[in-house]
């Protein structure tokens, strides 16, 4: 179910909240901003403002009821004598206010957020779409056909807008391709000045002579690549403060507070701290705040280069069964839990918190499921990236051979021998076989549904360029060869920009991953050991002291380790999401694979450090 269908059902369910629905509709239409209406139009949501407002009110009510449930649990935990703990009162106030307000804000602002996301993603499609247009124009200086080619070959959101533009031209909304390009440039110029400039350069290039045209087209690509690189540089420079805030708010301050909780109980008898408040604060409130802050950071990330889509029909995915993987993961988690319980039964120890077994079980389940489900996708994605990296050099070798006037079959077999050992060489070898042995033409040798060499190549970039080659060869081998060599240069430019962007962001994302997967578990483990020492020391003080054992007695070591362990797991999810979002954008495959890979290591590290810290600090206690 998507946002629209949920919104419609929710709006019908919550109509009772507003009484006269017609009056509410009228009031809602007047109260929303023009930006809100534009966002609905841009995203294509067939919703009315009143439906979204009703859904937001209903969500706030549900969130309020959920917060009351948490408050009731805290009250029950304190036997309904809440006045004995200031910290519990603070947590109850925060949950009661924060949850409904967050729900109201998220739902009511969702169309704006979605529209902003779509615009950012479309801006990331610019290098690919513009490169298709430029590549086509170098082979055939027909502006309308170049736009049709880009709209047809690209699966990006910007290409959808191009298809809409071409349709508008067909039904005479725009009189000519020049008018259509002017409209499109002005429309997107609000968000991307470099796209506007590049489109005007492309439009002027078709009216120039051959050499000048190629120079202008090259300049348009340079403008786009420089603009994309500049955007990412600006974004990376602005990331320093937000990442520092996340590191402070998410790792250092919360984990330092863990060791302070026993000491805080000394301040006043009314600063009683229970496990329920710590659970709500660490495992619900704090992760929620971090989640929305991370979401805000990633919403400002400019998209760069779209990821290659992987169809479910891929041969390596045909036998993939997510339900089966979930069952296997569940069995693995059960086995780990069983072994842990057997170990505790025969080797009980005060330095080994039994709640660690629950963390192991979750880590085993999630890691097993993620790796078995997403490893095939990751392997395919890596193969596509490897082939695309090889393709620039391969295209240059192929283009040079065709430029010499050699027939396609000879050029492909020569390139396959020159690039022997690479994945793209196998594709070229198969193409040559189709041309020579099966007597196919170039297009069929590449794209035939049964025997085409690109049948199992899922890179839209490679497929689009090979279509250009097939079209160019029909007209002139020499001209096609020259164009392919120039296209190879463009491709290398694109790859160099991608690489430089990765290098710029690499230091930051590697620091985030190291913090999430190594430093946070180590700091948490050491802090839990210190907490154990402080608790033991304070509980050993005379009863006449200001510390009352009851203030901290309800935080049993097992529960405390479990709550902090859950928080560490949440940190691993959140910080890896931030690192993945900065590095790759919205790449679910890479994210889930990374979590599956890092989670067990981090939980094992947390376990070892916690046990060693408790053992070390226990020897120091009086």
Feature roles, as predicted:
Residues 60-86, 249-273, 335-351, 520-546, ...:
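Juxtamembrane "helix exit" motif at the C-terminal ends of alpha-helical transmembrane segments
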Residues 92-184, 320-328, 338-452, 464-472, ...:
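Juxtamembrane/interface alpha-helical elements of multi-pass membrane proteins
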Residues 280-295, 327-341, 570-572, 601-611:
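Alpha-helical transmembrane segments of multi-pass membrane transporters/translocases
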Residues 102-106, 287-300, 339-342, 367-375, ...:
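Alpha-helical transmembrane segments
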């Amino acid at each position: 179910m998507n946002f629209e269908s949920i919104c419609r059902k929710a709006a019908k369910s919550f109509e009772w909240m507003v009484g006269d629905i017609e009056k509410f509709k009228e009031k809602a239409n007047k109260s929303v901003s023009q930006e809100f209406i534009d966002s609905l139009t841009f995203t294509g949501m067939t919703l009315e403002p009143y439906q979204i407002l009703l859904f937001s009110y209903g969500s706030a009510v549900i969130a309020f009821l959920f917060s009351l449930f948490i408050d009731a649990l805290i009250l029950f935990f304190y036997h309904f004598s809440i006045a004995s703990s200031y910290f519990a009162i603070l947590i109850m106030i925060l949950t009661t206010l924060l949850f409904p307000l967050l729900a109201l804000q998220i739902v009511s602002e969702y169309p704006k957020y979605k529209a902003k996301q779509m615009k950012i993603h479309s801006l990331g499609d610019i290098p690919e779409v513009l490169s298709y247009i430029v590549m086509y124009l170098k082979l055939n200086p027909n502006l309308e056909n170049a736009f049709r080619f880009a709209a047809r070959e690209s699966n990006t959101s910007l290409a959808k807008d191009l298809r809409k533009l071409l349709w508008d031209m067909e039904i005479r909304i725009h009189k000519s391709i020049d008018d259509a390009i002017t409209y499109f440039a002005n429309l997107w110029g609000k968000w991307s000045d470099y796209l506007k400039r590049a489109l005007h350069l492309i439009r002027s290039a078709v009216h120039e002579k051959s050499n000048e045209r190629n120079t202008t087209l090259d300049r348009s690509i340079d403008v786009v690549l420089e603009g994309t690189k500049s955007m990412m540089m600006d974004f990376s420079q602005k990331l320093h403060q937000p990442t520092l805030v996340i590191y402070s708010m998410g790792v250092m301050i919360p984990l330092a507070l863990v060791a302070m909780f026993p000491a805080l109980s000394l301040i006043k008898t009314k600063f009683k701290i229970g496990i329920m408040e710590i659970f709500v604060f660490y495992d619900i409130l704090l992760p929620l705040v971090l989640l929305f802050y991370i979401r805000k950071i990633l919403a400002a990330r400019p998209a760069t280069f779209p990821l290659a889509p992987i169809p479910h029909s891929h041969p390596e995915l045909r036998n993939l069964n997510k339900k089966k993987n979930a069952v296997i993961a569940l069995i693995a988690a059960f086995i780990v839990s069983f072994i842990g319980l057997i170990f505790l039964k025969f080797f009980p120890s005060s330095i080994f918190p039994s709640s660690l077994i629950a963390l192991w079980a979750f880590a085993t389940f999630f890691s097993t499921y993620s790796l078995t489900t997403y490893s095939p996708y990751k392997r395919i994605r890596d193969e596509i990236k490897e082939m695309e990296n090889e393709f620039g050099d391969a295209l240059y070798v192929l283009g040079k051979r065709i430029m010499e006037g050699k027939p396609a079959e000879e050029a492909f077999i020569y390139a396959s021998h020159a690039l022997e050992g690479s994945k793209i060489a196998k594709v070229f070898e198969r193409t040559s076989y189709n041309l020579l042995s099966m007597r196919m033409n170039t297009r069929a040798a590449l794209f035939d549904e049964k025997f085409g060499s690109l049948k199992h190549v899922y890179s839209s970039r490679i497929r689009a360029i090979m279509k250009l080659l097939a079209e160019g060869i029909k007209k002139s081998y020499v001209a096609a060869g020259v164009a392919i060599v120039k296209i190879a240069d463009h491709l290398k430019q694109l790859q160099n920009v991608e690489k430089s962007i990765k290098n710029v962001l690499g230091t930051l994302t590697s620091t985030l991953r190291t913090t999430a997967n190594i430093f946070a578990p180590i700091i948490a483990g050491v802090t839990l050991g210190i907490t154990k020492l402080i608790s033991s020391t304070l509980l050993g003080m005379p009863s006449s002291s200001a510390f009352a054992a009851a203030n901290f007695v309800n935080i049993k070591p097992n529960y405390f380790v479990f709550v902090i362990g859950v928080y560490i797991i949440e940190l691993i999810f959140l910080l890896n999401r931030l690192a993945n979002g900065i590095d790759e954008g919205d790449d679910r495959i890479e994210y889930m694979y990374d979590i599956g890979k890092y989670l067990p290591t981090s939980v094992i590290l947390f376990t070892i450090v916690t046990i060693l810290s408790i053992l070390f600090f226990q020897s120091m206690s009086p």
